[in-house]
From Swiss-Prot:
InterPro entries in the record: Flagellin/pilin_N_arc, Flagellin_arc
Gene that specifies this protein: flaB2
Keywords: Archaeal flagellum, Glycoprotein
UniProt key word Lipid biosynthesis: no
Name under which the protein is recorded: Flagellin B2
Propeptide: 1-12
Subcellular location: Archaeal flagellum
Cleaved signal peptide residues: none
Organism from which the protein derives: Halobacterium salinarum (strain ATCC 700922 / JCM 11081 / NRC-1)
GO molecular function annotation: structural molecule activity
Alphabetical list of NCBIfam families matching this protein: arch_flag_Nterm
């Protein structure tokens, strides 16, 4: 069963040094494998979190159903003093809390970011009203409709005049953006409200 080799040239010898080198190589390989496994797990969890965030940004959006402006006829010229957006959830969106949203207003003479105020709209804030649904600031169902109210007379110099336009970008708490161009008609004469 065992064969004894008596010739010195055919015998292999393993010394203590060779054994130490072998053990060191095994330890280094084990540590490297552990680092690779940990890195792969970290990258997988990071990639999964990034994918979920990207999915939320794409799917948790609002749709702007309509926009109109209230016309102020008390001055020497007619102006839109309030701009209003009617919004709803986009298809497949989760609950959207408009009180945690912002609106970027880029108008003819002003650029500002509006935040939510539950009571009044002014130069720095917008407010909301429930048109359909139980909440005035949270879109829970796709059938819910909420009106966003912005005080154009406070945000811009004396309101929006005939023919002017403003770019409105609504950013939800998920980071998704919806942009709407509100265009004031060329004539506001004898009107109380106009489509923007």
């Amino acid at each position: 069963m065992f064969e004894f080799i008596t010739d010195e040239d055919e015998r292999g010898q393993v010394g203590i040094g060779t054994l130490i080198v072998f053990i060191a190589m095994v330890l280094v390989a084990a540590i490297a494998a552990g680092v690779l496994i940990n890195t792969a797990g970290y990258l997988q969890s990071k990639g999964s979190a990034t994918g979920e965030e990207a999915s939320a940004q794409v799917s948790n959006r609002i749709n702007i159903v309509s926009a109109y402006g209230n016309v102020d006829t008390s001055g020497s010229t007619e102006v839109v003093n309030y701009a209003n957006l009617t919004v709803r959830q986009a298809a497949g969106a989760d609950n959207i809390n408009l009180s945690k949203s912002t609106i970027q207003w880029i108008g003819p003479d002003t650029a500002t970011t509006l935040t939510y105020d539950g009571t009044t709209a002014d130069a720095e804030n917008f407010t909301t009203n429930s048109i359909k649904g139980d909440n005035a600031d949270v879109l829970v169902d796709q059938s819910d409709r909420i009106e966003i109210v912005m005080d154009a007379a406070e945000i811009t110099t004396n309101g929006l005049k005939a023919g002017e336009e403003v770019q409105l970008t609504v950013t939800t708490q998920y980071g998704s953006k919806t942009t709407y161009w509100a265009n004031v008609p060329e004539s506001l004469k004898d009107k109380n409200a106009v489509t923007l």
